[in-house]
C-alpha cells in the first residue's frame, strides 16, 4: 500500500533541496524520545527494561502516526502528535493495553462472566458496545483495504476504556467485580489484537 507525501512542520521534504529525513534516523529519534519519557514515568524499571519499552513505543509511534491517515491524504508529521501518551497516538493505545494488563495482574483470580445485566453504568455499556465492533472493523479494513480504520478504532477502544476506568471502581467493586474485570480482560485482548494487526508491540507495562 502506497501513501501520499509526508511533510515536516518546516515544510515538504525535498531531495533536490536536501530536506530529507531517513527512516533509520527517524526511528532512532523516536526511540530516544520515548526513552526519555519512560525514564521520567518509570524510575522503578531497570535500564534494560526501559530501553526495551522505549523501542516498542518509538517504533509503534511512527507506524501508528502514518497508518492512521488515509493513504491518499498528505499529512504533517510532528513528534508532539506521534509520542502523545494521551491523544490519538500509538503510545496511547499501548499505554491503555499496559494499564489493562496491570489491572488483570492485580485482580488475581476472578471468574469470567458474561452477565451483562450487571453492567449498568453508561461507561460500561459504551465500552462493551465498542468492543463488539471489532470483527466488523477487521472485516472492513481487510476487504476494502482501509487500514486507517484500525488506528481509529483502537483509539475509540482506548478512550472508552479510560473513561470506564475513571468512572467506576473495578478491583474494589462488590456485586459486579467479576463482570468488570472480565470487561477489562476483553479490552486487553482487543487492544492487543489491534496493535498486532498494526505491526506494533503490545507492552504489558509502560
Q: Can you say where each PLM-predicted feature lies in the sequence?
A:
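Non-catalytic interaction-recognition regions
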Residues: 1-206
Amino acid at each position: 500500500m502506497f501513501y501520499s507525501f509526508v511533510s515536516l512542520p518546516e515544510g515538504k521534504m525535498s531531495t533536490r533541496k536536501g530536506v530529507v529525513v531517513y527512516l533509520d534516523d527517524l526511528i532512532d529519534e523516536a526511540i530516544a524520545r520515548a526513552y526519555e519519557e519512560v525514564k521520567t514515568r518509570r524510575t522503578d524499571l531497570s535500564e534494560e527494561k526501559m530501553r526495551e519499552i522505549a523501542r516498542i513505543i518509538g517504533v509503534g509511534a511512527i507506524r501508528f502516526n502514518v497508518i492512521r491517515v488515509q493513504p491518499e491524504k498528505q499529512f504533517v508529521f510532528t513528534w508532539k502528535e506521534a509520542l502523545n501518551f494521551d491523544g490519538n497516538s500509538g503510545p496511547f493505545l499501548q499505554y491503555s493495553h499496559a494499564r489493562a494488563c496491570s489491572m488483570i495482574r492485580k485482580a488475581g483470580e476472578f471468574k469470567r462472566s458474561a452477565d451483562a445485566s450487571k453492567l449498568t453504568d453508561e461507561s460500561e455499556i459504551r465500552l462493551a458496545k465498542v468492543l463488539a465492533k471489532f470483527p466488523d472493523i477487521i472485516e472492513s479494513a481487510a476487504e476494502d483495504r482501509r487500514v486507517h480504520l484500525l488506528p481509529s478504532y483502537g483509539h475509540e477502544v482506548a478512550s472508552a476504556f479510560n473513561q470506564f476506568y475513571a468512572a467506576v471502581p473495578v478491583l474494589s467493586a462488590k456485586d459486579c467485580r467479576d463482570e468488570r474485570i472480565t470487561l477489562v480482560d476483553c479490552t486487553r485482548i482487543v487492544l492487543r489484537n489491534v496493535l498486532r494487526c498494526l505491526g506494533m508491540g503490545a507492552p504489558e507495562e509502560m
